[in-house]
Amino acid sequence: MIDLTQEKQEILIKNKFLAKVFGLMSIGLLISAVFAYATSENQTIKAIIFSNSMSFMAMILIQFGLVYAISGALNKISSNTATALFLLYSALTGVTLSSIFMIYTQGSIVFTFGITAGTFLGMSVYGYTTTTDLTKMGSYLIMGLWGIIIASLVNMFFRSSGLNFLISILGVVIFTGLTAYDVQNISKMDKMLQDDTEIKNRMAVVASLKLYLDFINLFLYLLRFLGQRRND
């Protein structure tokens, strides 16, 4: 009876941690969606960002800096600061993602977002419930991720449609798998953390960022297949 009660308590603690992670991730996605749409409707902001390559690159560099601050320098900042940086990152990502409204129809963007949400939810449930250890699969997926990053950089020069198609397929597969892998790791994270609320809150922000990036990248790769271009 004592063991059963302890097990239930551990499950409740784990679920509370996961709820915090998914809640913060969802807020980040909502902020990104709002900023993406608002930016796409503001001609002045679009002109400032997308007509000047320096402005756009500056935003990208700031985003990389925020990711480092949230994850790499986590021990140097408070959980509240980390949360604020994550929300700022979500807003900036929304601004840079506003370009998709110039390329694809609004209907196809909404449709792809729905497909992404369904896929993400399914893989999250799988990652949480499966008894299979996904560590080995995760290692291959991370290697594959580096592979498509390198291939994407190479294709910036060669502009091969065949390679671009292959990268898109691999991107969908990799981020679908990474969603399950990350959720499984996050579901185990609470056991490894000390009974320190501040540390748990910091790690919840990092976990939210991981899942946020999985979702955004899966969405962008699916959009390559499901998005209807405005000039079609």
From Swiss-Prot:
Alphabetically ordered keywords of this record: Cell membrane, Membrane, Transmembrane, Transmembrane helix
tRNA processing in keyword set: no
Pfam families cross-referenced by the UniProt entry: Bax1-I
Topology versus the membrane: Multi-pass membrane protein
Family annotation (InterPro entries): Bax_inhibitor_1-related
Entry's localization field: Cell membrane
Top-level division of the source organism's lineage: Bacteria
UniProt keyword Cell membrane, yes or no: yes
Disulfide bonds: none
Residues annotated as transmembrane: 17-37, 54-74, 84-104, 107-127, 138-158, 161-181, 203-223
GO terms for cellular component: plasma membrane
Similarity comment: family membership: Belongs to the BI1 family.
PANTHER family found in the cross-reference section: BAX INHIBITOR-RELATED (PTHR23291), PROTEIN LIFEGUARD 4 (PTHR23291:SF50)
Protein name stated in the entry: Uncharacterized protein BB_0539
Species the sequence originates in: Borreliella burgdorferi (strain ATCC 35210 / DSM 4680 / CIP 102532 / B31)
